[in-house]
Amino acid sequence: VIKAMQENRVSAECFNMSSGYGYNDLGRDTLEKVYASCFKGEDALVRPQITCGTHALALALMSNLRPGDELMSPVGKPYDTLEEVIGIRPSKGSLAEYGVTYSQVDLLPDGSFDYENIKKAINDRTKLVTIQRSKGYATRPTLSVTRIGELISFIKNIKPDVICMVDNCYGEFVEEKEPLEVGADMIVGSLIKNPGGGLAPIGGYIVGKKECVENAAYRLTSPGLGKEVGASLGVIQSFYQGFFMAPTVVSGALKGAVFAANIYEKLGFSVIPNGTESRHDIIQAVTFNNSDAMIAFCEGIQAAAPVDSYVTPEPWAMPGYDSDVIMAAGAFVQGSSIELSADGPIKPPYAVYFQGGLTWYHAKLGILMSLQKLKERNLVNTDLLC
């Protein structure tokens, strides 16, 4: 990160606010060069006008697919909020409504790629392959950059011109390499996750091949305008500072995830990944098999928060999901999942997904508070930790 900032001559002038059209915004343009350099892409789009990770993914998909094209997922069903973007669940403005078809190949029971059926699924209309790095609300392992590279190589050998896009949410700075370094054409993510370092108040990014990024820019703004417009308003310094802090913040979040895995594995719960496995994102899944324990866990995470610690999280019908979802996130930035947070759908197997913590110490406190809530309700036997 430091090298990328130095090579692209980041200066104090880059932190100046722009408004209106945002023409000649030095800070915005330089930041996009920093992202491209750091993630090894030809170009980047890093904007506060991209509201969340789902928005960034929808933008990347809709700008690089045309009616008659087919989108294919070789790693099973995508994250819940993308179902309406794609049209798996009907929604206005979906890809399906614009004549883009969708196919998917599920992972094999052992979590490996089903290469035989992936080969069968690729056809003349397959324009873009989407690879979700993180597990989402599933209980499969997160994909390593190495495995993603192997999958992309297999796909490109079958159809060299297919666009391979990686949903990089929760994975930035966890490994030494990023997906663009192993053959991906685009990586997409959110600034209120890893790369924002807990300081970015909003935003998303798309980094990769120049043509793919340009297509996304024209979709975000307007044909003919592209990257030339889009004021950075007053958030640009937090984008830079958050990106600078991101590797350290991610490191603390990883320590918290490992701690959670070890604690809950000793208590007899199923955890993915376990306490000794390699990490490829910041998410720790714990399966409780009942809603009471799942809700108590989230209440403990909320009670450890610096913001809204007095609030009791409750399941609700969150937009984009097909079941009630509970979310614990006493965060400075609403919905920030690089801050201490936990969430999950209230449905079997009642798995909760823990992530974040701007410091390792805060992540540790959150886990201990979650344990306290479970103990108070006799939902766990803490003697197993002795």
Regions found by a protein language model. Name each.
Residues 1-30, 325, 345-354:
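N-terminal entrance/gating region of PLP-dependent enzymes' catalytic architecture
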Residues 2, 6-7, 11-14, 22-23, ...:
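Conserved PLP-enzyme active-site core in the AAT-like
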Residues 18-22, 26-44, 56:
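Long amphipathic N-terminal alpha/beta scaffold segment
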Residues 39-40, 95-100, 277, 345:
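A generic structural signal for short, non-catalytic loop/turn and secondary-structure boundary residues
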Residues 265-385:
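Conserved C-terminal alpha-helix-loop-beta "cap" of PLP-dependent enzymes
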